[in-house]
Amino acid sequence: KQPSENKDEFTLLVVGGSQGANIFDKNLKNLIVKISKEKSIKIIQQTHQNNITDLKNFYTKNNVKNEIFSFDENFANSIIQSDICISRAGASTLAELSVLNIPFIAVPLPTSKDNHQYENAFFYEMKNCCWIVEQNQFEEKIEKVLKDILYDKSNYFKKKKSLKKLNFQNTWANENKKILKTVNEN
């Protein structure tokens, strides 16, 4: 999916992963409703199976287009439908978002072993492919980051371009060219 710079509706994917959907369930829903009164947003949100009905009813009651799903459903399809993602920073999730060229706001799980989720997100941030919002600053920073993206898409499109460049640099064909060049130099 390639949103145009003039597109009115933005589709936001929210993914908490196996260990972290609760922070998003509790702390994002009111913000999404608030922003949806100013900007057209569709939310696709992963949550625990027990929370699907409540979350769906909340968004529907507040006139927010939504698709709510549990962890075991088709994740790739949800990514393809989205313009941007708020996610934990597990390596496989970030790799999937990267390959599908979806900029993301990474919220690393602070209890991850050796802080590996922060390191995963930092890799992409250094390449200008994502935003990082640490969990202890989530409530105070997420609104500003989301509004900056929704109201001025220039930084969003820069991140999409950076993801595309990163993905090209990491394609097998390009890696093979580098290997052949090295072999031929020797």
Q: Where on the chain are the PLM-derived regions?
A:
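Short hydrophobic beta-strand element within catalytic cores of glycosyltransferases
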Residues: 87, 103-114
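Donor-nucleotide binding loops and adjacent catalytic segments primarily
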Residues: 3-85, 118-121, 133-142
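Acidic, glycine-centered active-site loop in nucleotide-sugar glycosyltransferases
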Residues: 101, 118-130
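Conserved donor-nucleotide binding/catalytic region of nucleotide-linked donor-dependent transferases
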Residues: 131, 136-170, 185
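Short, acidic/turn-prone active-site loops that include or flank metal/cofactor-
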Residues: 71, 91, 109-113, 137
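Acidic donor-binding loop of glycosyltransferase active sites
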Residues: 64, 80-95, 102-103
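Short glycine/serine-rich donor-binding loops of glycosyltransferases
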Residues: 75, 93-97, 101-102, 106, ...
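Short, amphipathic alpha-helical "lid/cap" segments that border enzyme active or binding sites
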Residues: 29, 139-143, 172-180
